[in-house]
């Protein structure tokens, strides 16, 4: 909804109902890999290969499962979280750059997940947001505008979520 309010021309596809070739043929100018249940490489459908293909070509944002796909694509460890976070908010501290530009730190973010990306983070990625418990809430590719957030920026209970998507 926020992306539509921001003027984006949105096309939505289930990750298991579109191929990479079909996605490429759409010639997107941005790509959002959205939430979903399951494990990133097992249940992510086209998402991991879409991240690999589009990184460096267009801006990419992975949300929740998409964030986990980003971590996994580059060899990061995705595993069970130390605590389940379904419908709970947490303060998130960030670096104030890229998707976090003009967003106060910390801010409250809505979370719905039972998996997280763990340290060590692959060399291609950097951690850009964490909780007070040091859970990774944001990743960025070091060379390209490819980001991942573990929380739900689209939730009304995430402060500044619309600004994050605008960035």
Task: Tell where the protein language model's regions lie, with residue ranges.
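Cysteine-nucleophile active-site neighborhood
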Residues: 28-102, 108, 165-166
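Proline-aspartate-enriched helix->loop->beta-strand connector
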Residues: 23, 27-29, 153
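Catalytic beta-strand/loop cores that center a nucleophilic Ser/Cys/Thr
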Residues: 96-144
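Acyltransferase
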Residues: 156-167
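Short, charged N-terminal beta->alpha structural module
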Residues: 1-6
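Short hydrophobic/Thr-rich beta-strand motif most characteristic of the beta2 strand and flanking loop
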Residues: 9-15
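Histidine-centered divalent metal-coordination motifs
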Residues: 64, 113, 152
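Short acidic active-site motifs
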Residues: 17-22
């Amino acid at each position: 909804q926020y992306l539509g309010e921001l003027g984006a021309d949105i096309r939505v596809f289930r990750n298991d109902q579109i191929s990479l070739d079909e996605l490429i043929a759409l010639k997107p100018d941005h790509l959002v890999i959205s939430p979903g249940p399951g494990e990133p490489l097992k249940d992510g459908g086209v998402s991991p290969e879409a991240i690999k293909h589009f990184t460096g070509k267009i801006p990419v944002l992975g949300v929740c499962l998409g964030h986990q796909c980003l971590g996994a694509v580059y060899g990061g460890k995705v595993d069970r979280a130390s605590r389940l976070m379904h419908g709970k908010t947490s303060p998130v501290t960030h670096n104030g750059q890229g998707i976090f530009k003009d967003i106060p730190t910390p801010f409250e973010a809505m979370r719905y997940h039972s998996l997280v990306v763990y340290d060590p983070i692959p060399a291609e990625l950097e951690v850009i947001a964490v909780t007070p418990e040091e859970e990774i809430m944001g990743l960025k590719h070091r060379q390209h505008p490819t980001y991942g957030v573990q929380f739900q920026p689209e939730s009304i209970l995430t402060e500044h979520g619309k600004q994050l998507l605008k960035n």
